């Protein structure tokens, strides 16, 4: 349980600092990956929605 609490604190601390982990820029060598990196946080939401579509396809058995 303390591990989950500390992880939440770290995430909140990083999110509150604009120059923190979540808002860091990629190095120039990886600049071509910017569109992919911008889209990556949405991927888990798509899997969540896919689960509902799948269940609707099998009539929510």
UniProtKB/Swiss-Prot annotation:
The chain crosses the membrane at residues 36-56. InterPro entries: PSII_PsbK, PSII_PsbK_sf. It is a single-pass membrane protein. Keywords: Chloroplast, Membrane, Photosynthesis, Photosystem II, Plastid, Reaction center, Thylakoid, Transmembrane, Transmembrane helix. Residues 1-24 form a propeptide. SUPFAM superfamilies: Photosystem II reaction center protein K, PsbK. One of its GO terms (cellular component) is photosystem II reaction center. It comes from the Eukaryota. One of its GO terms (biological process) is photosynthesis. Pfam families: PsbK (PF02533). It is found in: Plastid, Chloroplast thylakoid membrane. One of the components of the core complex of photosystem II (PSII). PSII is a light-driven water:plastoquinone oxidoreductase that uses light energy to abstract electrons from H(2)O, generating O(2) and a proton gradient subsequently used for ATP formation. It consists of a core antenna complex that captures photons, and an electron transfer chain that converts photonic excitation into a charge separation. Belongs to the PsbK family. PSII is composed of 1 copy each of membrane proteins PsbA, PsbB, PsbC, PsbD, PsbE, PsbF, PsbH, PsbI, PsbJ, PsbK, PsbL, PsbM, PsbT, PsbX, PsbY, PsbZ, Psb30/Ycf12, at least 3 peripheral proteins of the oxygen-evolving complex and a large number of cofactors. It forms dimeric complexes. NCBIfam families: PRK02553.1. This is Photosystem II reaction center protein K. The gene is psbK.
């Amino acid at each position: 349980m303390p591990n989950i609490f500390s992880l939440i604190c770290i995430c909140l601390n990083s999110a509150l600092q604009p120059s923190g982990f979540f808002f860091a820029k990629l190095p120039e060598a990886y600049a071509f990956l910017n569109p992919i990196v911008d889209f990556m946080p949405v991927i888990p939401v798509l899997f969540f929605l896919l689960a509902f579509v799948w269940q609707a396809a099998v009539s929510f058995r």
